[in-house]
Amino acid sequence: MPKKRLVGVVVSDKMDKTVTVKVERLVKHAKFGKYVKRTKKFYAHDENNACRVGDVVEIEESRPLSKLKRWVVVNILERSKLSETPEIEETIDIEGGSEQ
């Protein structure tokens, strides 16, 4: 049986070799018939700490790696614009004299 694969957005990368991935799905409401977004968070193994917050990733089901971690990051589909931090140059003007 093939392993399940899901696509989601990284919402946390604070842990070592682990990311939290938010996966959204549409579910039809039983009574009203309207499609409603449902989200679920998965802990996924990121061996090289390559993922950053906001990245769109593909995760795959795996054997249990820890108490909560059962998924592995397979692919980074889209990099976040937030993860690309441009260098900011600051210039400070210091005037030697004082005004009277």
From Swiss-Prot:
Coiled coil: none
Gene3D superfamilies per UniProt: Nucleic acid-binding proteins (2.40.50.140)
Entry keywords, A to Z: Ribonucleoprotein, Ribosomal protein, RNA-binding, rRNA-binding
PROSITE patterns linked: RIBOSOMAL_S17 (PS00056)
Pfam families from the UniProt entry: Ribosomal_S17 (PF00366)
Similarity-based family: Belongs to the universal ribosomal protein uS17 family.
Subunit structure: Part of the 30S ribosomal subunit.
Protein's name in the database: Small ribosomal subunit protein uS17
Gene that produces this protein: rpsQ
